[in-house]
A protein has these predicted regions:
Chain A
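Long, charged N-terminal interaction/targeting segments
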Residues: 1-57
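Long, charge-rich boundary regions
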Residues: 2, 20, 30, 104-115
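Short loop/turn motifs enriched for small/polar and acidic residues
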Residues: 32-36, 64-68, 109
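Short, flexible, mixed-charge glycine/proline-rich loop motifs
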Residues: 60-67, 77-82
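Cys/His-enriched microdomains
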Residues: 70, 86, 104
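Short cysteine-rich clusters marking metal-coordination/redox-active sites
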Residues: 72-75, 88-91
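Short functional micro-motifs and their immediate structural scaffolds
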Residues: 80, 93-97
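Short linear interaction segments
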Residues: 100-101
Length: 115, 222
């Protein structure tokens, strides 16, 4: 989608969080990306490294992939899915709908302070 | 020296989502049912809208916001049908966002032709409707699951062309339902008019349901 502008918004969120934590240094952040958020994870990881390193030295960027859940239309098995086609690993039938996997959020930050 | 992990859980698109929530609240208060139409380029959004407007204009107040990367061509086509049309030229942008969308019973938002990015941006609409023409291939729902997953309805367009194609309606339905079993399906041809009655009566039903919900919410207030 728009991974570079998403990375910039992620940096803004981190900066706002840091304002609440005086004298802290950002060391890591975690971003949760749903399988159906239309975001390319590799590109986002690359863009995050670029934009974060402009302001913060040595920050570790973790991109956490969030799968969706599908239910088999035939045997009813619930299984995790990250991409189509959504076929049941047990019986091979197609799913009856996919839920979840829509996340796109800053999950956590890690900071170090002199305290 | 101490290290700690701070839970944030803030949506990356929270600024857009907040604007969308404000737009949604305003539209609902004014009892405007807003449909965000999403599809690939050339699947027939503008043509379907022209037919829909002609059928529904006698009974409802309609409005259209038409997003295009460049030109006002889509908006100009719709203006000829005698309804208020707002053109949004994104100037290269491949989707609309909530900032660009701010009185009618039924408002259509014709998004930019693209099945990827428009799925990700909430505009504050009542529902997303995804369009897909029969010439595009049956596996569109599998290739672009985000758009189909978030839509309330799927409108198949150009069905008059089916006799000339190797196209299985059953397979599209199977693929679409594997992504989203709650999709309401419409098979339409703007050329012959097939299926347009079902589509417009579904829209009219949604408008009526919103009005009923708003009225009962109003009468429930002390």
């Amino acid at each position: 989608m728009h991974e570079l502008s998403l990375a910039l918004q992620i940096r803004e969120i981190c900066e706002r969080e840091l304002e609440k934590l005086p004298e802290s240094r950002l060391t890591a952040l975690g971003v949760e990306v749903g399988a159906f958020s239309a975001v390319e994870v590799e590109t986002l990881s690359f863009c995050l490294q670029v934009v974060m390193s402009e302001r913060f030295d040595g920050v570790r960027c973790e991109v956490i992939r969030q799968p969706g859940t599908a239910a088999c239309s035939s045997c009813g098995l619930q299984f995790e899915v990250t991409q189509a086609p959504f076929e049941c690993p047990s019986c091979g039938a197609l799913a009856r709908g996919v839920s979840g996997g829509d996340s796109l959020q800053v999950s956590y930050i890690e900071v170090e302070s002199e305290r | 020296m101490s290290a700690e992990r701070v839970t944030v859980k803030e949506k990356v698109l929270s600024a857009n989502d907040q604007l969308a929530a404000e737009t949604r609240a305003r539209l609902e208060a004014e009892r405007v049912f807003a449909v965000n139409l999403i599809s690939s380029p050339g699947s027939g959004k503008t043509t379907l809208l022209e037919c829909t407007v002609d059928l529904m204009k006698p009974s409802l107040r309609l409005g259209v916001m038409a997003g295009d990367v460049q030109t006002r061509n889509d908006a100009d086509r719709l203006i000829r049908h005698g309804i208020p049309v707002e053109a949004i030229e994104t100037g290269g942008g491949c989707h609309l966002d909530a900032r660009q969308v701010s009185r009618a019973d039924l408002l259509f938002i014709e998004n930019v032709g693209n099945l990827v990015c428009p799925a990700g941006f909430d505009l504050g609409e009542s529902v997303k409707v995804v369009l897909m023409s029969v010439t595009e291939g049956e596996d569109k729902p599998l290739k672009y699951p985000a758009a189909f997953k978030r839509a309330a309805a799927l409108v198949l367009t150009k069905t008059d062309l089916v006799p000339h194609l190797e196209f299985s309606l059953e397979r599209v339905i199977e693929y679409a339902r594997s992504v989203n079993p709650d999709l309401t399906l419409f098979s339409t041809s703007s050329y012959t008019g097939d299926g347009l009655a079902e589509w417009t009566s579904w829209l009219a039903g949604q408008v009526a349901a919103l009005k009923r919900a708003q009225e009962s919410a109003k009468s429930a207030r002390p």
